[in-house]
Amino acid sequence: LSQQTARHARPTLVSFDVYGTLVDVRGGSREAFGIILREAGAAHVDALEFWEAWEAANIRRYWLPYRPYREICRASLEETFQRFRIRGDPDLIRHYFDAFARFERFPDVDETLERLVGRARLAVVSNIDDDLLAATDLGRRFDVVCTAERARGYKPNGTLFRFLLARGDADTDTLLHCGQSQHTDMVGAKPLGIRVAWINRRGLTRAPGVPKPDHELRDLRGVPELLPRQDD
């Protein structure tokens, strides 16, 4: 192995997307958006379909000049109500924020993180406000915490990943990022040269224009194998 390749194989910082990678935001949001739609008089609309449209609107806003996550969520709800021809109050987004304390970790998370302790520093990196991350039960403390609020920017344009590299005292040879989102994790990290493990829990096909990840896993259980053995 060349020196550069050897370094690339030995990450000292492993970062994780939170919502969708560590925490089941899809399941938790379905309940919250069901409440939002009922209160907006649109109980006939499929909550998951509506949530996916709302999430796509959020991601489009991540590319714009920084606004707090809560503001983006409210603006995207207003837009999605209009798209679905629903006369709803965008302040109903409070039901989504209230749900954060109920979001559950995926069953593979605790075991995998425990296996990584002592082998690399662990980070979380999330398009989120600090208070919402604090309300989320991650089950453990992380060595490095990076949020959109702290970085004053989001993942897709690279702002949050550049903040991660600086805050984590890492470079592209010593960082492995694990994330589920094609349009935030892969689009934001790969152009910076960051090694990415796509945690493809739902078995999706990579969308056109999305950079190819370095690794693709169905859950987090394979992440420790991406690090060198401790006796190497």
Features from the language model and the residues they span:
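Asp-based, Mg2+/Mn2+-dependent phosphohydrolase catalytic module
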Residues: 1-14, 45, 110, 114, ...
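N-terminal helical cap/lid subdomain that shapes the substrate entry/recognition surface
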Residues: 7-107
